Amino acid sequence: MAGVSTQAQERDARRWRPGRSFIGLLWSLVPLVIVIVLLVLWQKGAPSPVTSVDPGPDIAYAQQISPVPLPAPGPLPGNWRANSSHVDAPSGEKRSPVTLTIGYLTEENKFAEVVIGDRPVALLLTATQPGATADGTVPVGASRWQAYRTQRGEQLLAGTVGKASVLVTGDASGTDLQQLAAAVR
């Protein structure tokens, strides 16, 4: 009978051994979950600042290759900063269409974008903001520009400067969009 009690003792010892039960499994996962939560919280950190770019080289390149003189945004108020800039054009010089796009962050950290192209306003509008609907006119400097609503609900201003077409849009205020449009010369 001594052998039977030994088997019962071994069975009882196995049954209550730590780590061999569901509860033991859960307790062994607790440190792992804590480490994962701490890693996730540590990785969040502070939001990364928006980088600023110099649109000067893109402006110069677009003006060089465009068959019509392209204007460019002049000085903007306060803490506006360019955060994106690119030129879309076919290869070779003096070939159309050339489109210069520059994105800005306003003083209120709202986005404003200017698109300058050598195509008529209607073609540039269709190419860059399909589905925009007319929404009256607004004063820009000494002239009036056509106002539109984009599919995202943002205001868009469209006008001409010399022979070039200019579109200004974004989630910035109407006043900021008008300032950006007036700065294009």
Named regions from a protein language model:
Residues L26-W42, L76, I102-Y104, V114, ...:
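Generic hydrophobic secondary-structure signal
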Residues D54-Y148:
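Short, solvent-exposed recognition patches
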Residues M1-A82:
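Charge-rich, low-complexity N-terminal segments
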Residues A134-R185:
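A short, solvent-exposed beta-edge/loop patch
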